[in-house]
C-alpha cells in the first residue's frame, strides 16, 4: 500500500500573498478543513488556511508568501500521509490501493489488473486491462470479494452481466 495519498493538485495562484487554487482529488473536498499538513514535493508543510470557492479549494501553506512562490508550484500534487487520511467505512477502499489488483471470476478466468477506477454518479467502474480491456461496474451482485492482502478481486463471470455484440 502507498504511504502517501494524493488529495489535490495546485492549478493556479489566488491573490498576491501565496494562496493557491487547488483542484481537490478526493470525494469530499471539505476534508481539507481537517488537514494540518500536506506533503509538497516531498516536504511536509503546515496548512495555514483553507477557503472554498465554487468547486476549488483555496489553500495557504506555511512558507509560501508571494504570488511568485505560488506560481512555481502550479501543477504540483498535494499528498498526505496515510495516517492522516479519512477513515473509510467497511468495504471502502482508496483508489490507489485498488490499482494493480488482479481481477478474476468465480470460474478462475483472469481478466487482468485494475488500471484505474472511474467514478460515475451511480457507481464506480473498474477499468481492467488484460488481453482485452474490460469495464467492470462496481455493484454488489457483480463484485463478490475484495481481498486487499492478496490484491485479488473476484467477480461474477462477465457472461452473466456483460452483453457482447
UniProtKB/Swiss-Prot annotation:
Highest taxon of source: Bacteria
Pfam families the record matches: PRC (PF05239), RimM (PF01782)
Any one GO molecular function term: ribosome binding
Subcellular location(s) of the protein: Cytoplasm
GO cellular component: cytoplasm; ribosome
GO terms classed as biological process: ribosomal small subunit biogenesis; rRNA processing
InterPro entries in the record: PRC-brl_dom, PRC_barrel-like_sf, RimM, RimM_N, RimM_N_sf, Transl_B-barrel_sf
Domain (PRC barrel) ranges: 90-161
Key words of the record: Chaperone, Cytoplasm, Ribosome biogenesis, rRNA processing
Disulfide bond as UniProt keyword: no
Family named by the database record: Belongs to the RimM family.
Domain notes for this protein: The PRC barrel domain binds ribosomal protein uS19.
HAMAP family: Ribosome_mat_RimM (MF_00014)
Function: An accessory protein needed during the final step in the assembly of 30S ribosomal subunit, possibly for assembly of the head region. Essential for efficient processing of 16S rRNA. May be needed both before and after RbfA during the maturation of 16S rRNA. It has affinity for free ribosomal 30S subunits but not for 70S ribosomes.
Complex and partners: Binds ribosomal protein uS19.
Descriptive protein name: Ribosome maturation factor RimM
Organism (species): Clostridium perfringens (strain SM101 / Type A)
Gene: rimM
Amino acid at each position: 500500500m502507498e504511504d502517501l495519498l494524493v488529495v489535490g493538485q495546485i492549478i493556479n495562484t489566488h491573490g498576491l500573498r501565496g494562496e493557491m487554487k487547488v483542484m481537490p482529488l478526493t470525494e469530499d473536498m471539505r476534508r481539507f478543513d481537517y488537514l494540518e499538513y500536506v506533503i509538497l514535493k516531498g516536504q511536509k508543510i503546515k496548512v495555514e488556511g483553507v477557503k472554498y470557492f465554487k468547486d476549488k479549494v483555496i489553500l495557504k501553506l506555511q512558507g509560501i508568501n508571494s504570488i511568485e512562490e505560488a506560481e512555481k508550484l502550479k501543477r504540483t500534487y498535494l499528498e498526505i500521509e496515510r495516517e492522516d487520511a479519512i477513515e473509510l467505512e467497511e468495504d471502502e477502499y482508496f483508489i490507489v490501493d485498488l490499482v494493480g489488483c488482479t481481477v478474476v471470476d468465480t470460474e478462475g478466468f483472469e481478466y487482468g489488473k485494475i488500471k484505474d477506477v472511474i467514478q460515475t454518479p451511480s457507481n464506480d467502474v473498474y477499468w481492467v486491462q488484460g488481453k482485452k480491456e474490460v469495464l467492470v461496474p462496481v455493484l454488489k451482485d457483480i463484485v463478490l470479494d475484495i481481498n486487499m492482502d492478496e490484491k485479488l478481486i473476484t467477480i461474477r463471470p462477465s457472461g452473466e452481466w456483460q452483453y457482447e455484440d
